[in-house]
Amino acid sequence: MSSLNNEEWDLLISGKKATLQYPIPLLCYPAPEVVSIAQIIDHTQLSLSATGSQIDVLCAEAKEYGFATVCVRPDYVSRAVQYLQGTQVGVTCVIGFHEGTYSTDQKVSEAKRAMQNGASELDMVMNYPWLSEKRYTDVFQDIRAVRLAAKDAILKVILETSQLTADEIIAGCVLSSLAGADYVKTSTGFNGPGASIENVSLMSAVCDSLQSETRVKASGGIRTIEDCVKMVRAGAERLGASAGVKIVNETRLGNRQVDEPMEPTNY
């Protein structure tokens, strides 16, 4: 795949798009067990002004509530790993965050450092300006370089769907999956609207059509248990949220509202 030029990638992506069933169905996956929703949440603190004590609180909450991972910036990986030692909670480190325009060498360096410091998962921002310019070979090689530098990590590639067209989202999913990503992720949460049912459904449909093991992570604007249920029903298997404690407490209080069925949409 790394030897394909942009024109060849364009043909491949167009072929994958042609296999999709239109209209893309919404909310066609089973609803989650809300009592165990914490197990698929990456509990997130990515503020540039975050302090060490805030990371400690994040980790303490993750231990108490049983979140999948904590998601932090590179400088806090070691601290989070140390705090969570002996627990089942993983540590996710963001890479190339949040612009995605870091050089490939910078992303690889961040990935290696994160792994050395104990991160178990990486959330890498795709160079989405390249994607919009149809620089598909560069996008693929950028992701592939991080994949090869962190072979033991779960790798999630952030598309930044708010900045992309539907066709670009399809292309981003194809490139990420073929480069070896474990997940494609909607958003950084720092650039426009976050996850939408339509985009998560489209990403899920693309991954399904590829018959790959790449899954979908929804993030950005997920603040309630209802938001979580909708995203899972749209196909997300992991959720990123800074409101994880509030969400889990909703389930404990019995607030388990499930969204109403929606009609399929067409891209």
Swiss-Prot record:
Keywords: Cytoplasm, Lyase, Schiff base. This is Deoxyribose-phosphate aldolase. GO terms for cellular component: cytoplasm. Its EC number is 4.1.2.4. Its main location: cytoplasm. It is an enzyme of class 4 (lyase). Belongs to the DeoC/FbaB aldolase family. DeoC type 1 subfamily. Pathway: Carbohydrate degradation; 2-deoxy-D-ribose 1-phosphate degradation; D-glyceraldehyde 3-phosphate and acetaldehyde from 2-deoxy-alpha-D-ribose 1-phosphate: step 2/2. Catalyzes a reversible aldol reaction between acetaldehyde and D-glyceraldehyde 3-phosphate to generate 2-deoxy-D-ribose 5-phosphate. InterPro entries: Aldolase_TIM, DeoC, DeoC/FbaB/LacD_aldolase, DeoC_typeI. It is found in: Cytoplasm. Pfam families: DeoC (PF01791).
